[in-house]
């Protein structure tokens, strides 16, 4: 790959000297989509991602406009060729279908993570370590000033809040991003035996999760009493 296996092209990351963009927002001829959060989504001529990510992206963006846009689903740990490149996806542990990408060319491997979570999750595939020579990592909270409590502590606090609210005879309300965080909370509570109701926007995402094997059978839609 030479000295710089990755480059900026029109403000987007691209594998040097190729058409393969990484989580591009602007339309590209070919792009890898690590996951379906809005800050990574774009409409491209060809999109490489896991089947779950492609389904979530279609749910969020709608069908391709004017018939443009080819979805190229790829399975984890299954190398495939793209021109002179060999690509392989690995779970990223961020949300359902999230993936890291390993790009090999001329014996040199580039690793690109997108958002990455190495802690155990309730509703996403567990992250794996991929071997590479050059690693490009998204680090939203990479600065040392960001210090969060351990995840088990946070989950215990959520459960304590829910129990306290129910003991007081009131309905506990939890807020979370509609894709990812909401399903983590709902799956955690459902597995603990709580019956939950989800906002219709969250419920629509839940259906995609369920279609890809994440059991959310105790999660019911909440009928809105007013427009949202």
Each PLM stretch: what is its role?
Residues 219-228:
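Single conserved hydrophobic/aromatic residue that forms the stacking wall/gate
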Residues 173-192, 201:
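Divalent-metal (often Zn2+) His-rich catalytic cores of metallo-beta-lactamase-fold enzymes
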Residues 2-26, 30, 36-175, 180:
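His/Asp/Glu-rich metal-coordinating catalytic cores
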Residues 54-58, 184, 203-208:
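Short, charged/polar "capping" segments at the starts of alpha-helices
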Residues 37, 127-129, 188-193, 213-214:
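Short, solvent-exposed amphipathic alpha-helical segments in soluble enzyme
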Residues 197-214:
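Long, charge-dense
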Residues 156, 166, 195, 213-219:
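The feature marks the mature, well-folded catalytic cores of soluble enzymes
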Residues 67-74, 193-201:
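Short hydrophobic/aromatic-enriched beta-strand-loop microsegments
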């Amino acid at each position: 790959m030479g000295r710089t296996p990755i480059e900026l092209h029109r403000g987007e990351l691209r594998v040097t000297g190729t058409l393969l963009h990484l989580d591009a927002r602007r339309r590209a001829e070919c792009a890898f989509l690590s996951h379906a959060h809005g800050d990574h989504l774009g409409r491209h001529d060809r999109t490489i991602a896991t089947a779950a990510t492609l389904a979530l992206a279609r749910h969020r963006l709608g069908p391709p406009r004017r018939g443009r846009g080819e979805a190229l689903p790829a399975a984890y740990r299954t190398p495939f060729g793209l021109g002179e490149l060999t690509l392989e996806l690995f779970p990223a542990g961020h949300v359902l279908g999230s993936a890291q990408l390993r790009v090999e060319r001329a014996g040199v491997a580039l690793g690109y993570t997108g958002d990455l979570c190495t802690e155990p999750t309730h509703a996403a595939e567990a992250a794996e370590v991929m071997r590479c020579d050059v690693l490009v990592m998204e680090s939203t909270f990479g600065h040392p000033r960001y210090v969060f409590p351990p995840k088990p502590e946070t989950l215990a606090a959520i459960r304590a809040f829910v129990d306290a609210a129910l003991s007081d005879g009131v309905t506990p309300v939890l807020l979370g991003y509609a894709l990812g965080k909401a399903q983590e909370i709902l799956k955690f509570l459902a597995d603990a035996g709580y019956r939950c109701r989800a906002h219709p926007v969250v419920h629509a995402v839940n259906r995609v999760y369920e279609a890809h094997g994440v059991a959310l059978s105790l999660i019911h839609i909440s009928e809105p009493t007013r427009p949202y």
